[in-house]
């Protein structure tokens, strides 16, 4: 029985919760409704939770209130994607509720889950049931009920998991699209993984990290960061040493804990990755030979690598002396836009964007990424263009915590971002610009062409893995094995008699022949529409389209 949770135990709950989510991130990703190759729910929740875990591991405290503040800060700054932001808000409310406590009992644990739900619902502009919010709400309500008749935090957490799982299984009945695709809510599943890790910690158990099959062609680590090293002489261990050892039958039996302890005596920056056949090692040492000799106790050395880091540092200094690093531009009003692809970034810069954050579909920037740009620009005012629905909440979270007066224009696509930026008036006030830029978003119809990462049926459209998909905003309107057929079906849906301008932004994977045939088709079918073509260079999406 566990009647009290202090900072030490809560830290272990966080660590085990983060590990369990990490182990199941791919499973959570697979539950995403849309088969688009983007920054998925599992990935974003995992990165967010990992940020919270790392902050906790670096600032341990026996006081649960103090540890909660640390955890909340790590989640807040590391939040990526809407699912990550909601996760951070759930625990922001949770941790706020315990900030004055040194330890908590089952009743306060239940009340804190409820406080987290209330905070998260307030943070979402239009809460949707059948999502992570519903699972969190149902679990918290169950916790409040159970806490009335148990003082055991283990028993309480077990009940929370049962009710959270029931709620998760019911999500398709609340959200039609989940039922159509045949999945439960991915965010709710991610939250359940965290709760299951919490229970493991309360029981004194550990969530083991998944052991991935090791790639025999790659070493553990290749690059060195000399940030903070002023003199070459400051480098204590001068040789970056790496080895791969294939375990031998008649050699010493491998015990990871013993292996790590022994290897740590040779130097620092130790990394050890192993599976059933091979162990990979990276360590900074003065004696590479001793490292290799130790490795031979376990089996055959199959790859070795030694780099002189002092010589690397001398080369870094030589290069820095010849290349002055440009400082981040400081401005009165920062116009910060999220971009994907060099061509798109150049378009934004030419239109007046002062700062570009690389991100978009495959890697959503965190709250901290956006905050850093605002702070380093030393601006008094900031306008943020997320250009992706999954970056919107992180942008709003960043705007709410910086000292500068910051606003977010709710752009959900690159074309919307371009249209909004076109409306920026250097002489207008921040609020005036916010109003006219936001208004322009409604005048643009956005489309895109990409490929499917799995078989599914959604919005009445049958989709096969690797087939092309045409989307208008978030709705899939066409999916064919032939790229040109998919594009023309998409454009027929987008273009109308009163359409005036079609903007085409070409991605890095677009084929020239398809582009040429597409332009010819547009000119034949829609001769009155003016066509503007730009090289965007964006990954994942062969084309972005906008119609005005």
From Swiss-Prot:
One of its GO terms (molecular function) is glycerone kinase activity. Gene3D superfamilies: 1.25.40.340. PROSITE patterns: DHAL (PS51480). SUPFAM superfamilies: DhaL-like (SSF101473). GO terms for biological process: glycerol metabolic process. Coiled coil: none annotated. It comes from the Bacteria. Residues 8-200 form the DhaL domain. This is Uncharacterized protein SAOUHSC_01193.
